[in-house]
Amino acid sequence: MADDNLLTTLDTYLASGIHIGTQQKTEDMKRFIYRVRADGLYVLDVRKTDERIGLAAKFLSKYEPEEILAVSRRIYSVGPLKKFGQTTGITTAAGRFVPGTLTNPSSRKFLEPEVLFLSDPRIDRQALKEAIEIGIPIVGMCDTEHLTSFIDFIIPTNNKGRKSVSLVYYLIAREYMKNRGLIGEDVPFTYEEFLEKAMSVKVKVKPQQFQRGRRWGKRR
């Protein structure tokens, strides 16, 4: 059960390391930072992260699953990202983002999403660049060192840890489906299932593995 109106328990957030940033910060991310530790690591404000996850899910829930493209090139995000796509029906692209995916209609992998959800604005810079070019909104997981000029909706989080990334994907999947009336309080999937996918990654990711989105029934 969540506490103090959080999406999950504070203990779950802290155990995932979702609040652990880097030893660098930008002015863009300063408003989400709670403190700096003695070892120089910046710590994110968990309650602000929780709030932004909820708001991001609410924003994404305005779109059909096939209108959203979720991408990640970071290897430990691939498993949770695929689980995210399987759970929600949202289109996902894991691994290297092939140039022209959003801008070249002649490409076999050409997609026309209405919104982009990325796991790291630096690692996923090709997808970010193309989303900017075609003018669609961008939701992004951002750590303390990121520049966020082109991110329309920031989710402040540790986007490098397996546990933290798995938790973000799980919570957004859950809240997205709740907001669209597809599930109720009895959630048919767990954070542990997302985390298991992250922990099982041992091999190099193949270039751009797609999962096409699917349309669910009408929202309630």
From Swiss-Prot:
GO terms for molecular function: structural constituent of ribosome. Keywords: Ribonucleoprotein, Ribosomal protein. SUPFAM superfamilies: Ribosomal protein S2. InterPro entries: Ribosomal_uS2 (IPR001865), Ribosomal_uS2_arc (IPR023454), Ribosomal_uS2_CS (IPR018130), Ribosomal_uS2_euk/arc (IPR005707), Ribosomal_uS2_flav_dom_sf (IPR023591). GO terms for biological process: translation. The keyword Zinc does not apply. GO terms for cellular component: small ribosomal subunit. It comes from the Archaea. The keyword Amino-acid biosynthesis does not apply. Belongs to the universal ribosomal protein uS2 family. PANTHER family: 40S RIBOSOMAL PROTEIN SA. HAMAP family: Ribosomal_uS2_A. This is Small ribosomal subunit protein uS2. It comes from Methanococcus aeolicus (strain ATCC BAA-1280 / DSM 17508 / OCM 812 / Nankai-3).
